[in-house]
């Protein structure tokens, strides 16, 4: 893994994986896509889609743990605060050899700079929410979200995915 390459690729993901419009039907389709992918692969995780103050999709799959919803909340809070993916935030902080508490005063109990939460962006509007997965290693959480977004938006996942 090369942090600079990953950060460039995540910036491209965040630029290209944006919606023309996003409503509750779109949230359901995105959540169902993630649920199908995770179920087919037998991934024990929690899936959450929240539009700021309203949770609009939630699923927990076999193998998820009681800690996963808290990880979802903390990663989602990071996206809501910084308007970029929690994985990009974590990699940026790793590169700077710091953390959210030291750099921004954000407590670990409320924020997590670990992969798995991705901003839901509507073109011309900005970040309106976050889609979050927790339960896998952080890079896999992030990759699953990106794959589902790419499928739903008709984007070329192979051109967007992080290198192995």
Swiss-Prot record:
InterPro entries: PduO/GlcC-like, PduO/GlcC-like_sf, YBR137W-like. It comes from the Bacteria. Coiled coil: none annotated. Pfam families: HbpS-like. Belongs to the UPF0303 family. NCBIfam families: PRK02487.1-5. PANTHER family: PTHR28255, UPF0303 PROTEIN YBR137W. This is UPF0303 protein R02983. It comes from Rhizobium meliloti (strain 1021) (Ensifer meliloti). The lineage of its organism: Bacteria, Pseudomonadati, Pseudomonadota, Alphaproteobacteria, Hyphomicrobiales.
